[in-house]
Amino acid sequence: MGDWNLLGGILEEVHSHSTIVGKIWLTILFIFRMLVLGVAAEDVWDDEQSAFACNTQQPGCNNICYDDAFPISLIRFWVLQIIFVSSPSLVYMGHALYRLRDFEKQRQKKKLYLRAQMENPELDLEEQQRVDKELRRLEEQKRIHKVPLKGCLLRTYVLHILTRSVLEVGFMIGQYILYGFQMHPIYKCTQAPCPNSVDCFVSRPTEKTIFMLFMHSIAAISLLLNILEIFHLGIRKIMRALDGKSSSGNTENETGPPFHSTNYSGTQQCMICSSLPERISLLQANNKQQVIRVNIPRSKSMWQIPHPRQLEVDVSCGKRDWAEKIESCAQLHVHSPCPHDRSARIQHPGQQPCHSVFGPKNAMSQSWFGTMTASQHRPSSALETWERSQGPEASGRSLTDRQSHFQGSDGSARESGVWTDRLGPGSRKASFLSRLMSEKGQRHSDSGSSRSLNSSCLDFSHGENSPSPLPSATGHRASMVSKSSHVDSPPHSSFIIHETYVYVY
């Protein structure tokens, strides 16, 4: 037989780019096919034609009967089988080498990029550790000298397994059609020019039968390994997909609803838009994700709060310790009472739910309390105050004054009067801006040197009998000021804004 070194050297390269089942298949191909065929089977079929004898003296009858008994020598048939079954592996090897060169180029580019990152003096410690770990991984890939089996290379690998399986089945069927599973010692020849029926005798029939059964068995084992390898790749891919889904599920459970918390630094905007009750994620400035379920009422509204500091949204549904609220700086606190029916409800995880019912069912009211302060550039002068009182009667006022104290940077307490919106039959007709500016002028004449901070007041109300239109698209701008006084209880529903503007759309 010819030299198998060239084919063996190429298949050794395929061995390094195969799975564990593919390596077993290649081992069987090397040992039980090529080695057995080159060492033992060739000697068994060496005297195949010379020892084939027929009981006739008719010239040419022996050759005709031998050709009819052995259309192709089993040795050559098995050689063709090995070559054809190995050819898909050679095609896969060519693709793997191409991908390996491309992978090496990408690895070099990535290595240069990571080294350039390591030279960056502004790189923090955590990022340096990540880059160093990536460089070590690239060096390990260089030592392995192997391409990851994924993507187009994986598709080529599966295709070459299917192709060699089909070829294996074809050669097994061909061997069965030509010779069956047994080599008979006597062959009846009826071909011309042999007279009538001629008996021909085959040399070493039992030994040849053993080798035929052995090669059939090896072919069946190779086919079984091909099927197992396909299942192995499929199960591994399914397991990876399941692992990816489980990890993504765990991540989603840890981070909460689809809208995750985001840190805003610099001149950013905090926008909340809603037309239906949704689940949203609130912002937090301490680099920790905290997700809160919020049911937003059915109103087409959007409010923007530009602020040059990081914003944090905190939610509570009842009375809290207002000292903790005062100590936090650069935060946006949103408080909403827990309505009884179809109003906004905001509940923090771990917080006891509130069961407060206010107002009749056909005249619901919604109020928000917001506080936003800046940790730097806080004015030292006293804030002017706009306030308006409300009588104890539940007559019909729409603007109600709430007061709260705010602690400044110098430790002094400041009290800010704000307005809230409640439903009333005719009180919305009055312009709160005119009252605001008039009282501001009175306070300004008294204080003289006080400074005022511009802000905007949001007026959100919901009603069924007498709904009021939303503000215009350009938004309202008002000025809110404060004075030095104290209040015993925190406002239940109010909106206080310092050093910012709120636009209502």
From Swiss-Prot:
Residues 447-460 have a biased composition (Low complexity). Residues 437-446 have a biased composition (Basic and acidic residues). Residues 1-16, 98-165, 231-505 are cytoplasmic. It is a multi-pass membrane protein. Low levels were detected in skin, heart, kidney, testis, ovary, intestine. Expression not detected in brain, sciatic nerve or liver. According to PubMed:15147297 expression is detected only in horizontal cells in the inner nuclear layer of the retina and not in other neurons of the central nervous system or tissues. Detected in the outer plexiform layer of the retina (at protein level). Residues 38-76, 187-209 are extracellular. Keywords: Cell junction, Cell membrane, Gap junction, Membrane, Transmembrane, Transmembrane helix. Its main location: membrane. Residues 371-491 are annotated as: Disordered. InterPro entries: Connexin (IPR000500), Connexin_CCC (IPR019570), Connexin_CS (IPR017990), Connexin_N (IPR013092), Connexin_N_sf (IPR038359). It comes from the Eukaryota. It is found in: Cell membrane; Cell junction, Gap junction. The chain crosses the membrane at residues 17-37, 77-97, 166-186, 210-230. Residues 371-383 have a biased composition (Polar residues). Pfam families: Connexin. Belongs to the connexin family. Alpha-type (group II) subfamily. One gap junction consists of a cluster of closely packed pairs of transmembrane channels, the connexons, through which materials of low MW diffuse from one cell to a neighboring cell. Involved in tracer coupling between horizontal cells of the retina. May play a role in the regulation of horizontal cell patterning. PANTHER family: CONNEXIN, GAP JUNCTION ALPHA-10 PROTEIN. This is Gap junction alpha-10 protein. It comes from Mus musculus (Mouse). The lineage of its organism: Eukaryota, Metazoa, Chordata, Craniata, Vertebrata.
